[in-house]
């Protein structure tokens, strides 16, 4: 029979398939599957995945970032921390208003920043001499742009400005160009800068307290010790030399350790401005300088006399209130991002805790018997602090 004469095969039954059930709606997962780049929260991570997947970037990128960061770091440091072109050592920018000129009005205002050791000098003298009511205070904080700024929690109590630069710029005499630094002693009546050099502000406050009689007998700037004070103040500032040679820093600390092992304060039994200048450096050493500035040969706590000396001053009335360790750490590790680009804040060392700084210092024995028999002899607040700490 011919092929075409055979009956056709019966038609197969039609198989109807049901559509697959819809996938559960996961907007994030769907966006990630369709567009992993768009789903990424981090633009740098997204770009990295687009170019290289999940693998590490190639060595060329590492080299480019390394050299680019080094160049950017150098530029930032030249602006934020000027240095000697020949040696690379830190060179502090001279103050625009280095001395008190004339006689300021009675309406004075002090601007400080808690992380700054130079501003801390003025703040410490204000506390030691009992000038809190006489001298109102505004505390600036490091802003994201590196400028001293004010916040709702730490406002400009005088004018309500947002930046310290705006206070400088509001001066009546020709405005201001340059760095808006702290400390700043401001004449609120005449709207002009009195001084922004820390040691000169400290000396002025000593004279102000003596005239007001608010110092309680404490004289941080006695005429008979001024030559020694100036010598020690200059020596205390040599901590900046670690940028050039760390050996100079630790040689200076060794010399101070030796001197203070036989003398309660730098100039004998009397607390002076020289001690103020040194204290604001020492109280930051283990907290900041040891790790951030790579001063790692020894910690301050390893110097028995220096650490006891620091505790001695810390325990004087009003001093602890000027030492905000959290603000100091944040000001260095958070604001100085060229030195700590990750912005990670380390734990406060045990030696810098209030509990450690309030431990007995035992330095009363270094005071001469003549000073003890005199009942304080011109240093009443100092002996009051000693008795309070025991």
Where are these regions (language model features)?
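Amphipathic alpha-helical interaction segments
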Residues: 200, 271, 275-276, 280, ...
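N-terminal chloroplast transit peptides
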Residues: 1-29, 36-39
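Surface-exposed helix-capping loop/turn segments at secondary-structure junctions
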Residues: 211, 258-269, 292, 317-323
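A contiguous, mid-protein "functional segment" used to position or interact
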Residues: 305-337
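Acidic, serine/threonine/proline-rich low-complexity intrinsically disordered regions
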Residues: 240-243, 290-304
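GST-like domain detector, emphasizing the conserved glutathione-binding G-site
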Residues: 29-266, 303, 336-390
């Amino acid at each position: 029979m011919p092929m075409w004469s055979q009956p056709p095969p019966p038609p197969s039954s039609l198989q109807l398939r049901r559509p697959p059930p819809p996938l559960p709606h996961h907007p994030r997962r769907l966006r990630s599957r369709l567009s992993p780049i768009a789903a990424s929260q981090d633009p740098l991570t997204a770009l990295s995945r687009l170019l290289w997947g999940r693998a590490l970037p190639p060595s060329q990128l590492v080299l480019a970032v390394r050299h680019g960061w080094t160049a950017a770091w150098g530029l930032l440091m030249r602006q934020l921390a000027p240095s000697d072109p020949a040696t690379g050592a830190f060179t502090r920018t001279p103050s625009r208003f280095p001395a008190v000129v004339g006689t300021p009005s009675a309406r004075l205002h002090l601007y400080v920043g808690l992380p700054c050791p130079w501003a801390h000098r003025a703040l410490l003298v204000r506390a030691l001499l009992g000038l809190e009511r006489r001298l109102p205070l505004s505390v600036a904080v490091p802003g994201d742009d590196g400028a001293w700024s004010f916040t709702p929690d730490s406002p400009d109590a005088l004018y309500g400005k947002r930046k310290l630069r705006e206070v400088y710029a509001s001066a009546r005499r020709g405005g201001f160009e340059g760095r808006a630094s702290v400390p700043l002693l401001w004449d609120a009546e005449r709207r002009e800068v009195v001084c922004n050099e820390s040691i000169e502000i400290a000396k002025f406050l000593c004279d102000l307290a003596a005239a007001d009689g608010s110092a309680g007998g404490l004289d941080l700037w006695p005429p008979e010790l001024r030559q020694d004070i100036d010598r020690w103040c200059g020596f205390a500032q040599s901590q900046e030399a670690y940028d050039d040679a760390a050996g100079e820093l630790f040689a200076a600390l060794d010399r101070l350790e030796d001197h203070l092992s036989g003398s309660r304060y730098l100039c004998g039994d009397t607390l002076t401005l020289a001690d103020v200048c040194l204290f604001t450096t020492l109280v930051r050493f283990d907290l900041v300088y040891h790790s951030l500035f790579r001063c790692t040969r020894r910690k301050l706590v390893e110097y028995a006399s220096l650490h006891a000396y620091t505790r001695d001053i810390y325990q004087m009335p009003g001093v602890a209130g000027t030492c905000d360790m959290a603000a100091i750490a944040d000001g260095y590790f958070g604001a100085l991002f060229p030195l700590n680009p990750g912005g990670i804040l380390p734990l406060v060392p045990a030696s810098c805790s209030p509990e450690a700084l309030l431990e007995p210092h035992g330095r009363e024995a270094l005071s001469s018997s003549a000073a003890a028999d005199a009942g304080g002899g011109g240093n009443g607040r100092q002996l009051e602090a000693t008795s309070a700490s025991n």
